[in-house]
Structure formats: C-alpha cells, structure tokens
Amino acid sequence: MTVPTTRKDLMIVNMGPQHPSMHGVLRLIVTLDGEDVIDCEPILGYLHRGMEKIAENRTIIQYLPYVTRWDYLATMFTEAITVNAPEQLGNIQVPKRASYIRVIMLELSRIASHLLWLGPFMADIGAQTPFFYIFRERELIYDLFEAATGMRMMHNYFRIGGVAADLPHGWIDKCLDFCDYFVTGVTEYQKLITRNPIFLERVEGVGFISGEEAINWGLSGPMLRASGIQWDLRKVDHYECYDEFDWEVQWQKEGDSLARYLVRINEMTESIKIIQQALERIPGGPYENLEVRRFDRTRDSEWNDFDYRFISKKPSPTFELSKQELYVRVEAPKGELGIFLIGDQSVFPWRWKIRPPGFINLQILPQLVKRMKLADIMTILGSIDIIMGEVDR
C-alpha cells in the first residue's frame, strides 16, 4: 500500500470575482501553504466605467445622475461632493434650511450604508441572522428616501445651491419616529453580536493596524478611527452645519476587526443623535439658492433656430467653472471621499479626479492577510468595507 505524500508545493487559488464574500467583482490571487496565507494580490478593474472621463464631457447637472453609481449604497455622499465643488468655485451660498436637509439625508445614508455593511459582514463570518435583521431598518430608511426624493437608491436629490425639493408634509414626524425605533434596533444588534463568543473569536485581534500604519497607508474613515486616530472630516472641515449639533467622534484604539465593527455600530447611534437635533431645529426659508440661476450660461443663438423648435427635450442648465483648481472632501461612511476639480472657464471640468475611500483602504489588504488563515480573509476584507463601484470608478 502506498502512503500519500504531503503536498510540499504552494497552492495558488483564485477568490472571486464571482465569490459572494468579495462584495462585488474583486478578484484575489491567494498563495496558500495549507491554510496559511503566504501572499495575496488584488486584481481590480472589473467594474471600471470611466467615470472621471465621463465627467470631463458633461456639465455638472448632466453628471449628477452618474455619481450615484460610484458608491451605490451611500449615494447622498457622492451627490454632496459633486455639488460642493462648483459651489466653492462659484462662491455659492446654501440656505440654512437646505443645509439642514442635506445633513439629515447624509446621516440617513450613513446609517443605511453601515447597515448593509453589517449584515453581509456577519454572514461572511458565519452569522446569518443579523443579515435578515438589518433589512428591516434599512427598508424604513429607503421609505423615507422615497418619500422625500422619489427614488429608493439613486436619488439625484442634491442641487447646486440647495436640494431638488423641500421635505414633504409629515416627513419630519415620520423620520423622528424612525429615530426612536432605530435606537432600540441598535441595542438589539449589540446584544446579539457584540458579546457573542463565536463572533469575538473570529474578529478579535484579526487584521491589526497600528495608528502609524493607518496614517502611512492613507487610510480614512472607520479604518483610521479604529486605530486610535480621532479624525473625522465633519469636525475637521466644518462643512454644512455639523458644528451646530452635539455629537462625538467615535474611535477605538485596538486597531483590529472588532474595533472597526465597534466604530461603525457606535457611528450609527451618533448619526441618530445628529438627525434628531437637525429635525427639531430645522429652520424655515427656501430649500434652494435662487441666485444660482444667474450662473446659468446663455445658450447659443442656434437654439432659437427653426430646426430646434420641435425638440421636446428641455436643455439642462449649465454652470461655467472658473479657471482655478480645488480639492473638496466629505466624510463618507467608508472614509474620505474627495474630488480634485480643475475648471477651465468652460461648462465642462478640465479635470475631475475622484479620491474614493474604498480604493485607498483596500491597498493594505495584502499586508493584513499575510501569515493569517484562509478563513480570516473574509473577516479582514469585510471589516475594510469596500464597494467596487467606487474602487474601480
């Protein structure tokens, strides 16, 4: 009888791009020695759609529907960064009521994004129940979005100088009811997950990142704050009206997957505090800056020609971008979402560079999974929280 010999060669395995734990079309080429990970090489680009080049051939208004396809789980943030850039270029003031509405929508979108991170993350490490629970609260948020914007996901709600429409009658009361209900929902999650011994075994001490490493790799968002760095752009950049509310930056010092989970869970509670304060203090007044219309660039006279009278499509408003450059950023659920914009005295941007948080945060993955077990890849990748739409752009 021949005794089978032990395999001595390293094994190279493809994970993705169809694997359910890849959270999109991410492909990992993993080198294994048994169950131990020797090397990991991420392969990107399966969802590349040329979003930056499209922006250079569209006006800002025409481009707004495209941006919701970057991070399609936190679309309010991509819309916010898109309108913030021309607002700063043109020195356009946003009415106070519009700013409050923006904050409410941004924080609701942050909660929805964190919820849809939590469910699949728990499913990746073997806990299926929270995956079904999170859809209850997420559905309530989408009902609020649908009532205010008309769309559940791709909202197209933000406008240069304000928002597309005011909040409908009864919406504020409905949102306050949701906030009261959601506080009990977060408590339920913490009872179900946070002290679960099997969950702690899978995440505690896995994927450790020190504060120095987080800064050197350019990490942001919960990835940075879970490593002991108290950095939140809502506090640092003072954009919109976040300074008017009482809330705290959530952070942990352990730097592992458990710390990143705790940061996101606590951030949802802080978002509820911000929303409740904004709903109670929301001022009256206009929801858009009517002066923005003077920035509209007059169409060429050919639009009045006979041939164009039968075109039913109304020309979209355009805004001339002055000849300067700037970088704007917001604190998205996954980290720092930024845009580097160069104007050229034209209605089209000369350059529109997107700084997606997921792409930067994903760079540290090969270092985190080395010398770990194969099963830990799902835990570490899930704790990073990526959406391939913004990674590949």
Swiss-Prot record:
GO cellular component, one term: chloroplast thylakoid membrane
Keywords linked to the UniProt accession: Chloroplast, Membrane, NAD, NADP, Plastid, Plastoquinone, Quinone, Thylakoid, Translocase, Transport
Disulfide bonds: none
EC number from the UniProt entry: 7.1.1.-
GO MF assignments: NAD binding; oxidoreductase activity, acting on NAD(P)H, quinone or similar compound as acceptor; quinone binding
Protein's membrane topology: Peripheral membrane protein
Keyword Membrane: yes
Major localization listed first in the record, in broad terms: plastid
Enzyme class, spelled out: translocase
Keyword Kinase: no
Alphabetical list of SUPFAM superfamilies matching this protein: HydB/Nqo4-like
Membrane-spanning ranges: none
PANTHER family assigned to the protein according to its UniProt record, in alphabetical order: NADH DEHYDROGENASE [UBIQUINONE] IRON-SULFUR PROTEIN 2, MITOCHONDRIAL, NADH-UBIQUINONE OXIDOREDUCTASE 49 KDA SUBUNIT
Protein name, UniProt field: NAD(P)H-quinone oxidoreductase subunit H, chloroplastic
Species this protein is from: Nandina domestica
